A protein has these predicted regions:
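Active-site neighborhoods and metal-handling regions in enzymes and metal-associated proteins
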Residues: 3-158
Length: 158
């Protein structure tokens, strides 16, 4: 029988498994994280502004790489190789269009159309500090259903 939570002199356990707690950051570390956050946010909003009818997702990918570099950041997703995958991820972004729920791969063949619902996801790395951010946009004015989806999703965050 495992105890829900207990501590020993050196270790803390939850449901019988050792857990690590988050180390409190110094002001300098917080400031460094903020630099990565600003790079990620500015890049994401640049991509949002470029999401227009006729744009292809590979062009958005290349724009993201350029923007991240201009803010002194490296794309953390590019060449990321998780243990479960045979190959590393080849892109700086995940761009999902319509029914591609998450982690869509950019492609020259994926051209944005009026009403598309597009998820933009990226991770900025500045000196080892990572900022992971995502945003969903509707291309053009979209339809009532898509607008409602984004509205309800946004409201659920707060």
């Amino acid at each position: 029988v495992y105890a829900l939570f207990w501590t020993s002199s050196r270790q803390t356990f939850l449901f019988g498994r050792q857990v690590k707690f988050v180390k409190l950051k110094t002001q300098g570390e917080i400031d460094a994280m903020a630099v990565a956050g600003v790079a990620a946010a500015k890049t994401l909003h640049g991509l949002k502004d470029a999401c227009k009818v006729g744009a292809n997702t590979l062009a958005l990918e290349m724009m993201a790489r350029d923007l991240l570099a201009s803010f002194g950041a490296r794309p953390a997703l590019l060449n990321y190789h998780p243990r479960f995958s045979k190959e590393p991820y080849r892109f700086a972004t995940c761009i999902s269009v319509n029914d591609a729920v998450i982690h869509g791969q950019p492609s020259e063949k994926t051209v944005l159309r009026e009403g598309d619902v597009v998820g933009l996801d990226l991770v900025a790395d500045v000196d080892g500090w990572l900022a992971d951010t995502a945003l969903t946009v509707i291309i053009g004015s979209g339809n009532v259903k898509a607008q409602r989806l984004l509205s309800v999703t946004q409201e659920s965050m707060w």
